[in-house]
From Swiss-Prot:
Protein name: Putative aconitate hydratase, cytoplasmic
A family per Pfam: Aconitase
Location (main, coarse): cytoplasm
Catalysed conversion reaction: citrate = D-threo-isocitrate
UniProt: [4Fe-4S] cluster binding residues: C441, C507, C510
Residues that hold substrate according to the record: Q90, D209, S210, H211, R540, R545, R703, S784, R785
Keyword set, alphabetical order: 4Fe-4S, Cytoplasm, Glyoxylate bypass, Iron, Iron-sulfur, Lyase, Metal-binding
Annotated family: Belongs to the aconitase/IPM isomerase family.
Subcellular localization: Cytoplasm
Organism: Oryza sativa subsp. japonica
Domain of life: Eukaryota
Known role: Catalyzes the isomerization of citrate to isocitrate via cis-aconitate.
GO molecular function, one term: aconitate hydratase activity
GO cellular component: mitochondrion
């Protein structure tokens, strides 16, 4: 007989007004504990989950007490389990996840167990949005042409995902062309409150995309995790996490006329980066909340990874309920959501007196003080006020190469490169805009900035301004709803006239899917070493990400993207210099094309309608003709095609037995790479184009794949052979072994040969040598890319020694059995005199019971140096994963035994 639920005494019925009941719920007020009223709303969601899932095995009563006592336990970095309500995937991360699930089924069968035990136990939603590329732009047929090319390139991947949606229960696949995962999540998938088998509970989600945090704007707790962790969550494993501190961020006042949500989010990002919020939740509150639309909140929540927080959370209030109605959720559903959240102390009513909540630290921003700004040229938190942009650009040209520098000699700063663009004279200078993209989940779901951009285009058309034809302009909305309201407003035609045709519904320029520049433009840039610029309404602008030829990349609001496209350069002072000359020969200034807040609000009010959301999402599950024509087998085990260059059986479980291998130390390892600070997951495992001379290109060419069909690294994440070769393959990666030379090569220490990283790793492996990686601060920042851990593991990397790790990447390394070590405060490779030419031994006990989370570990080198590091296995559960050789073997053995 099943044991009684430890908290069954607080299971309470929620009555419906007018009779009947909505269901039952675990009532926080019924605990009669005064500490709950002081808890941040985001922590209450963790508390409810712990109570509901308490079985005194995966989650115990002590965990519940830790969360109730959050004020005292969070500073001690207490560990808690968390079981999210659902999992969200996109196709770049979803394909390798489904590949792993399929391989796990094979492993279960080989161990003599039931393969069907490998099945998601919570709802899994997979939105295909990362495969569209901007091959065709500035054309009314762009959407159809790009989609046809997308299907041609990705036929096999899409077929595999369609197989997954039938082979696994509880998995919804949203077909390509439907929109960006986070916007679809916000407008359609987000439940806010679940009612399953008569039990009600708050929606919560983990996603294999770091911008999953966008859903926090809807009052749903959600954040990005590695694909490896997401797979374990699907299979019923609790996530182990440190109970986070919560930064209370008070908003007062309201935004000034002409200031956008993007200006606000870039300001908030800079403030929070400065405050230091890594590993923490940020919870927004204050009277300024009522002035923030839900789309504005979602924009701020979306950029949590850029300010470093786990979440940027906006509790549910009346604004949330209005948005749920606007997006087509039924009145009955919204009434149920409100009733549950009010009854369980999770609803904020600003008309009632507020109980003062306790936060770990506090920040405050008067919205009235936010000014127009952009961020760049190489990092999202390097904010530049619009009025200071020209002088900032000139100092970037002067400064030595770095996050704010290009080191262009003074005498070359004003050079003009003239070239022929399809028969017409064209010119480029340093700072010329060659890509202007309204793109990414951050902004394309926000009607005020999207319609604002369209109004800028309209005013420019009326004044006779035109974007130069050599600027690659594009518009990639987050969902079909955007197209509907742009058409309803009559403004899409003006965006089209300026070259901003819709190119597709998905992630494009922001993740490097910007497509090629015109050959004449590419040649002008590379032959003359021009520092060309991209301006995009995205959330990431790390070097080499947007496009290999745009060395300066600025994040800006959609209306500013249009303004910079019209100006054709970032080297401009919008207050003093004209953007261009109008049809009557008069100079046109920024202020002439910039819409007022009232103008924008009026268009939003008349153009964004509930029926648009309903009709868009009713069509989603029906798919589209190209998707519906894909035929897939109906077997529960996948039949791998050994010749496939997209889907390949991974080697992780090949020789697996029922006995865990135990912890591995590291003996006399060579250093594969020696890095400085801010190495992103993009540097480790790029998502964009496959360089023609790279080991991955060589592999594909040997298998008969033409260069034009290489597709991107992101689209080939279902093939470990390609991805291992693509590890550390970013063309902008800086490795100290190369003394200033940039690119994906390293030195094979024993011979001194300079080789591609993959070839060097292969050489070490064939010689029987382990390898490690040395790194600086913020190692693994950026996207939640599990291949940034899988790739190094396949290359034979046994440990990474860094000054600090980004949260998701550290847990991914643990998940793949790689040891993360941190230098002691104030120390790093340079201060310890390490060049990377040494051999490294990491002394670890061979019995896992003798290892403690966070303990000191001694590292010795062959030249007699030794130093102490902190072992970054942060929890007992992570040590168990390490003992099993990673999280997935741990799950397989557990399921096979039960």
């Amino acid at each position: 007989m099943a044991a009684e639920h430890p908290f069954k005494n607080i299971l309470t019925t929620l009555p419906k007004p007018g009779g009947g009941e909505y269901g039952k719920f675990y009532s926080l007020p019924a605990l009669n504990d005064p500490r709950i009223d002081k808890l941040p709303y985001s922590i209450r969601i963790l508390l409810e989950s712990a109570i509901r899932n308490c079985d005194n095995f995966q989650v115990n009563q002590n965990d519940v007490e830790k969360i109730i006592d959050w004020e005292n336990t969070s500073p001690k970095l207490a560990e808690i389990p968390f079981k999210p309500a659902r999992v969200l995937l996109q196709d770049f991360t979803g394909v390798p996840a489904v590949v792993d699930l399929a391989a796990m089924r094979d492993a279960m069968a080989k161990l003599g167990s039931d393969a069907n035990k490998i099945n998601p136990l919570v709802p899994v939603d997979l939105v295909i949005d990362h495969s569209v590329q901007v091959d065709v732009a500035r054309s009314p047929n762009a959407v159809q042409s790009n989609m046809e090319l997308e299907f041609k390139r990705n036929n096999e991947r899409f077929g595999f995902l369609k197989w997954g949606s039938t082979a696994f229960h509880n998995m919804l696949v949203v077909p390509p062309g439907s929109g960006i995962v986070h916007q679809v999540n916000l407008e359609y998938l987000g439940r806010v409150v679940f009612n399953t088998d008569g039990i009600m509970y708050p929606d919560s989600v983990v996603g294999t995309d770091s911008h999953t945090t966008m859903i926090d704007g809807l009052g749903v707790a959600g954040w990005g995790v590695g694909g490896i962790e997401a797979e374990a969550t699907m299979l019923g494993q609790p996530m182990s996490m440190v109970l986070p501190g919560v930064v209370g961020f008070k908003l007062t006042g309201k935004l000034q006329n002409g200031v956008t949500a993007t200006d606000l989010v870039l300001t908030v990002t800079q403030m929070l980066r400065k405050h230091g919020v890594v590993g923490k939740f940020v919870e927004f509150y204050g009277e300024g909340m009522g002035k923030l639309s839900l789309a504005d909140r979602a924009t701020i929540a979306n950029m949590s990874p850029e300010y470093g927080a786990t979440m940027g959370f906006f509790p549910v209030d009346h604004v949330t309920l209005d948005y749920l109605k606007l997006t087509g959720r039924s009145d009955e559903t919204v009434a149920m959501i409100e009733a549950y959240l009010r009854a369980n102390k999770m609803f904020v009513d600003y008309n009632e007196p507020q109980t003062e909540r306790v936060y770990s630290s506090y920040l405050e921003l008067d919205l009235n003080e936010v000014e127009p700004c952009i961020s760049g040229p190489k990092r999202p938190h390097d904010r530049v006020l619009l009025k200071e942009m020209k002088s900032d650009w000139h100092s970037c040209l002067d400064n030595r190469v770095g996050f704010k520098g290009f080191a262009v000699p003074k005498e070359q700063q004003d050079k003009v490169v003239k070239f022929d663009f399809h028969g017409q004279p064209a010119e480029l200078k340093h700072g010329s805009v060659v890509i202007a993209a309204i793109t990414s989940c951050t902004n394309t779901s926000n009607p005020s900035v999207m319609l604002g951009a369209a109004l800028v285009a309209k005013k420019a058309c009326e004044l006779g301004l035109e974007v130069k034809p050599w600027v690659k302009t594009s518009l990639a909305p987050g969902s079909g709803v955007v197209t509907k309201y742009l058409l309803q407003s009559g403004l899409q035609e003006y965006l089209n006239k300026q070259g901003f045709h819709v190119v597709g519904y998905g992630c494009t320029t922001c993740i490097g899917n910007s497509g090629d520049l015109d050959e004449s433009v590419s040649a002008a840039i590379s032959e003359n070493d021009v520092v060309a610029a991209a301006v995009l309404s995205g959330n990431r602008n790390f070097e080499g990400r947007v496009h290999p030829l745009t060395r300066a990349n600025y994040l800006a609001s959609p209306p500013l993207v249009v303004a910079y496209a019209l100006a054709g350069t970032v080297d401009i002072d919008f207050e003093k210099e004209p953007i261009g000359v109008g049809k009557d020969g008069k100079e046109v200034f920024f202020r002439d094309i910039w819409p007022s807040t009232e103008e924008i609000a009026e268009v939003v009010q008349s153009s964004v309608l509930p029926d648009m959301f309903k009709s868009t999402y009713e069509a989603i599950t029906k798919g589209n003709p190209m998707w519906n024509q894909l035929t897939v087998p109906e077997a529960s085990l996948y039949s791998w095609d050994p010749n496939s260059t997209y889907i390949h059986e991974p080697p992780y479980f090949k020789d697996m037995t029922m006995s865990p291998p135990g912890p591995h130390g590291v003996k006399n390892a060579y250093c594969l790479l020696n890095f400085g600070d801010s190495i992103t997951t993009d540097h480790i495992s790029p998502a964009g184009s496959i360089h023609k001379d790279s080991p991955a290109a060589k592999y594909l060419l040997e298998r008969g794949v033409d260069r034009k069909d290489f597709n991107s690294y992101g689209s080939r994440r279902g093939n470990d052979e390609v991805m291992a070769r693509g590890t550390f393959a970013n063309i902008r990666i800086v490795n100290k072994f190369l003394n200033g030379e940039v690119g994906p090569k390293t030195v094979h220490v024993p011979t001194g040969e300079k080789l591609y990283v993959f070839d060097a790793a292969l050489k070490y492996k064939s010689e029987g040598h382990d390898t490690i990686v040395l790194a600086g601060a913020e190692y693994g920042s950026g996207s939640s890319r599990d291949w940034a851990a899988k790739g190094p593991m396949l290359l034979g990397v046994k440990a990474v020694i860094a000054k600090s790790f980004e949260r998701i990447h550290r847990s991914n390394l643990v998940g793949m059995g790689i040891i993360p070590l941190c230098f002691k405060a104030g120390e790093d490779a340079d201060s310890l005199g390490l060049t990377g030419h040494e051999r490294y031994t990491i002394d670890l006990p061979t019995n896992v019971s003798e290892i403690r989370p966070g303990q000191d570990i001694t590292v010795t080198t062959d030249n007699g140096k030794s130093f102490t590091c902190t072992l970054r296995f942060d929890t007992e559960v992570e040590l168990a994963y390490f003992n099993h050789g990673g999280i997935l073997p741990y799950v397989i053995r557990n399921l096979a035994q039960n």
